Amino acid sequence: MALSSTNIIKVIVVTDDLEKTVSAYKTLLGTGKEPAEQNTGHKEIRAPFMKYKGADITDTPMKVESVFSDNFWFEIIQPLGNNDPWAAWLKEHGTSICSICLLSDGPLEADEEIMKNAGFDSLFKHEKGYEAYEYFDTSKALGVLVEVKEQYK
């Protein structure tokens, strides 16, 4: 069974030098236009939490900047800690594409079950209260992690 959506909304790049990587992307793509829904007000619907490799965590320190294209954006992350999927990816692969993000059409839990049944474990989950996203360990099969995001309506 396939995921609820194949709508790729962003590509996540990890780097050890945010300014240098962002500059390179902007040189190639320009600054682009931020999607209208990107910075709208958020109403908290669920209680926030974060889990990494099944354990509760409280912080994922990082510097982040987005570079927008016509149909998705690049989220460029420089991890500043060492207890999250971005720091682990950077350590193993260097500056590179870490993951693709698909926008879910339904509850994240349904896509979570599909990924589990396909043999892909949850690596990181962040419930923000107004949206949730989850990273799945698809790196051996796909060469990148897959993030699925649900935005509550």
Annotate each PLM feature.
Residues 1-4, 153:
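Basic/polar N-terminal segments that are highly enriched at the extreme N-terminus
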Residues 12, 75-79, 123, 148-151:
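A structural feature that tracks compact, well-ordered secondary-structure segments
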Residues 84-85, 140-146:
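Short, charged/polar, Gly/Pro-enriched secondary-structure boundary elements
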Residues 51-53, 79-87:
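Short acidic (Asp/Glu) patches
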Residues 8-16, 65-75, 89-107:
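Vicinal oxygen chelate
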Residues 3-5, 14-71, 110-140:
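Core segments of cupin and vicinal oxygen chelate
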Residues 85-90, 122:
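A short, polar/proline- and glycine-enriched secondary-structure boundary/capping micro-motif
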Residues 9, 98, 132-134, 144:
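Generic beta-strand structural signal
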